[in-house]
């Protein structure tokens, strides 16, 4: 008999939520706010790490932004900007309509749901707290970001799984390189095929255009 799934590990962008929401809403919102945020928080160590003057810091943030940097300090600052936007009702996080039913099925069956994203853990928590379907925080057991390791390295998944049997974990992502790394660590994996995702040809992985068949 196949090993039953006890934990589902989910990516966010392109897996539970649309790439367009992140790229066309969250990222532009952050970029528009860098200068104002830095001006308000110039004395914070989390801002000073990027430079000594307002112009220098904003230039650095824009460079990191344009390069798609996964730098932890940068992602944390972005998360702080998004926190203000979520709390003020400027944005609500997008989720595909099959995500909430999956979360509820998992809860009913005692299957844990965890998140692993390049966005900071605080930003991940905001995403599920301020979703378009309401606060879904109670459905998420753990959150992981790149402080545990890059998503394309097998050791990151070993650290996440810990002493668990990796065969009881299912990782879903739209990124084949992440799936490769997770599979090397013994996890079950599946490719999220969502509207707006880049086409993937011959990945060799089970493909999920919908999560309705899971659990």
Swiss-Prot record:
Pathway: Amino-acid biosynthesis; L-methionine biosynthesis via salvage pathway; L-methionine from S-methyl-5-thio-alpha-D-ribose 1-phosphate: step 3/6; Amino-acid biosynthesis; L-methionine biosynthesis via salvage pathway; L-methionine from S-methyl-5-thio-alpha-D-ribose 1-phosphate: step 4/6
Cofactor binding remark: Binds 1 Mg(2+) ion per subunit.
GO biological process: one example: L-methionine salvage from methylthioadenosine
Residues at which substrate binds: 117-118, 151
Alphabetically ordered keywords of this record: Amino-acid biosynthesis, Cytoplasm, Hydrolase, Magnesium, Metal-binding, Methionine biosynthesis, Nucleus
Annotated Mg(2+) binding sites: 11, 13, 174
InterPro entries from the UniProt entry: Enolase-ppase_E1, ENOPH1_eukaryotes, HAD-like_sf, HAD-SF_hydro_IA, HAD_sf
Any one GO CC term of the record: cytoplasm
Leader peptide range in chain numbering: none
Pfam families: Hydrolase
Subcellular location, record wording: Cytoplasm; Nucleus
Catalytic activity: 5-methylsulfanyl-2,3-dioxopentyl phosphate + H2O = 1,2-dihydroxy-5-(methylsulfanyl)pent-1-en-3-one + phosphate
EC number, UniProt record: 3.1.3.77
One example GO MF annotation: acireductone synthase activity
Catalytic EC class: hydrolase
Cofactor(s), by name: Mg(2+)
HAMAP family named among the record's database cross-references: Salvage_MtnC_euk (MF_03117)
Subunit (UniProt): Monomer.
Family assignment from sequence similarity: Belongs to the HAD-like hydrolase superfamily. MasA/MtnC family.
NCBIfam families from the UniProt entry: enolase-ppase, HAD-SF-IA-v1
Function of the protein: Bifunctional enzyme that catalyzes the enolization of 2,3-diketo-5-methylthiopentyl-1-phosphate (DK-MTP-1-P) into the intermediate 2-hydroxy-3-keto-5-methylthiopentenyl-1-phosphate (HK-MTPenyl-1-P), which is then dephosphorylated to form the acireductone 1,2-dihydroxy-3-keto-5-methylthiopentene (DHK-MTPene).
The protein's name in its UniProt record: Enolase-phosphatase E1
Species for this entry: Schizosaccharomyces japonicus (strain yFS275 / FY16936) (Fission yeast)
Gene: utr4
